[in-house]
């Protein structure tokens, strides 16, 4: 319960901060499309720099302490933004430095918490635990942008970071109060490099994980592009306000919350394999409606909202399913490294996807760029249909693969 509460607070703060960053860069610092793509890339660049070592370190350390330390670092970095704004010294470079620090902290927090869940929940309940944490993420998506949009309507965008810092304080307090005993990390005399190589060899040799790893990496590249283009579509092409953007994103998260709750129904009726394929492809296809809304400006807000709700619903079912499958397959001593490798695949390619999306949008226009990146995401989803994971007919981690 404390982990769930802490993650809910952290996700709300993250979403408020993400909206504030977009608003500051676009409206206050007047950043170009390319600069916005670079700023978004810096927030995930840390996974390329320390993603793999972080997994090995987390396997050596107590996960709860790692999460607390990461939160304290984020709090310190976040409070520098409103301070610089008050002193009239806020620059795009400062914003980029903070984004990089937040990215580094997020690497350790995310790897630790994904590795912590299987240690405090039995394998039978890993799916339920992940569903609850994903519901927290969707609560953050639903409440964060709306709260952030409302806040940015009454205070300057840089001051919104104070609320983000406050949510990380709440998250730290909740995690600190967890009393479930954490198993002592397995001690190893192996070097850091040897442990990283062991983790890579495990994923590479696992016939379900490795093909899934490749498809997830490709999908993450495309999703990063879509994510950086949507605020440009809403704020610049459709001339909506930051408040409206926040409300649109919040509405979309309702679908994600419902997806986290109804995932067991999908698994019971379709099994893991077909659930992975169907929900991923549908979840990406409906995004096509968002750039198409340019041609119906009077209905654009409704089109983007409905598309966001549907996409979030299906992709949440998919994400919880693939995450739970990975955790059930992986032995406990490898959890940190396995999660770090997948995070490396997802977040490591996202800086490239974000940056490329900014360049493509600058040359072809936002609408064409969104169509292109949506097509890439669909291709990645179709590829999953040809992996061993798609042939899992059961609802457990040791199913029969036909």
Where do the PLM segments sit?
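Hydrophobic transmembrane alpha-helices of Major Facilitator Superfamily
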Residues: 12, 16, 104-112, 221-225, ...
